[in-house]
Design a protein with these regions (language model features):
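Canonical Radical SAM [4Fe-4S] cluster-binding loop centered on the CxxxCxxC motif
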Residues: 15-53, 107
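N-terminal [4Fe-4S]-dependent radical SAM core
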Residues: 1-22
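Conserved AdoMet/S-adenosylmethionine-binding subsite of the radical SAM
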Residues: 57-60, 64, 80-225, 229-237
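Short glycine-rich or small-residue beta-strand-to-loop segments that form or flank ligand, phosphate
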Residues: 21-23, 73-76
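Short Fe-S-cluster ligation motifs
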Residues: 58-75, 240
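Auxiliary Fe-S-binding modules of radical SAM enzymes
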Residues: 191-323
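Glycine-rich, often proline-containing surface loops adjacent to acidic residues and nearby aromatics
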Residues: 16-18, 33, 66-73, 172-173, ...
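Residue-level recognition of the N-termini of beta-strands and the immediately preceding loop/turn
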Residues: 70-72, 102-105, 142, 243-247
Length: 323
């Protein structure tokens, strides 16, 4: 994206109308180095405070120019790798601007599960939580998008205490994870994990389809199997855990939700819809692909009826870069 004066913003992504992703330059690493991660290593080594100030101002200006944006998602890497004093430079800039369109600040992080001490005993743990409180007291909703890949990650006392301390600030924790072959491709585990998350006061949010990273051939789960795992787990939990959605692919046209396998006019098909789309008119529109038990991504699927999916022409015209 860019500002109206032509300034290009390299640390941002505005794919969906209401949500802006922001990549602080100081968050381009993580407490964990998951081999299935889809965020490639990014730049470091700049004059941190100076760069943060400038980025914060540009983010505010972009939000002023785009009143349709209600949510800012801090991502990376992992924003919680930053010291609290550095992270607050960004959040204070947003709060001080008193933007009427900004309703929610989201933080995508693995720290809750992988390094809970960020919120317990690190030198800036208390300052981090005070910053969370400040955001909430401003009237802005704070959502911690916590990555939990397995039930066992919820079993330790530090994890439970970190969740408690975060929730005491008024922040809400929503949980998400990719479905990973050899790791968590088990419906019973997912059901128990969602139930445990609810018991700890968290909200199950997404089951993702693992992206096309270097390890996809190991971690990838066929879409048909992924949907069956999700559906089986979904049936085992109460309504409080049925806030979760999936399996979802963050593909080029948007977040593609695999609804299930059906039969139309004697033809076995896969039913899908967009939970988020490059164009808001695409969201919620059902579409169908030929049944393919080996497909692991949207690109592997073929339209069940016609030669193209309904969004393809507009996607190609508006969003495909030409040489």
């Amino acid at each position: 994206p860019q500002l109206k004066d032509g300034t290009k913003l390299y640390g941002m992504q505005h794919k969906y109308d209401e949500t802006c992703l922001f990549f602080p330059s100081q968050s381009q690493t993580c407490h964990a180095y998951c081999s299935f991660c889809f965020r490639w290593p990014q730049f470091v080594g700049m004059d941190e405070m100076k760069f943060a100030m400038r980025e914060g101002e540009q983010l505010v200006q972009y939000l002023k120019e785009h009143p349709e944006i209600s949510d800012v998602l801090f991502t990376g890497g992992d924003p919680m790798i930053m010291k609290a004093s550095m992270f607050s430079v960004y959040t204070d800039a947003l709060l001080d601007a008193k933007l009427p369109n900004l309703k929610t600040i989201r933080i995508g992080t693995k720290a809750v599960s992988y390094w809970p001490y960020k919120f317990l005993t690190d030198s800036d743990a208390d300052e981090t939580l005070k910053n969370f409180e400040k955001i909430v007291k401003s009237g802005t909703h704070l959502a911690i998008m916590a990555h939990f890949n397995h039930l066992v990650e919820l079993s330790t006392d530090p994890i439970k205490e970190a969740i408690k301390r975060i929730r005491n600030t008024g922040a809400q924790i929503r949980t998400q994870s990719p479905l990973l072959a050899h790791i968590n491709d088990d419906a019973d585990m997912w059901a128990k994990m969602w139930q445990k998350q609810v018991s700890l006061g968290c909200i199950p949010y997404y089951m993702f389809v693992v992206r096309d990273t270097g390890a996809q051939q190991y971690f990838g789960v066929p879409l048909v199997k992924a949907e069956k795992i999700f559906r089986t787990a979904f049936r085992k939990v109460s309504g409080l855990a049925r806030t979760v959605r999936g399996p979802s692919m963050s593909a080029t046209p948007g977040k593609v939700h695999v609804l299930g396998v059906s039969e139309i006019n004697g033809q076995k098909v896969m039913a899908l819809q967009l939970l988020q789309g490059r164009e808001s008119e695409w969201v919620g529109v059902p579409f169908f692909a030929k049944y393919d038990e080996n497909a692991i991504w949207l690109d592997d699927l073929e339209p069940a009826f016609g030669k193209k999916f309904f969004f393809e022409d507009e996607l190609k015209t508006k969003y495909t870069k030409t040489a």
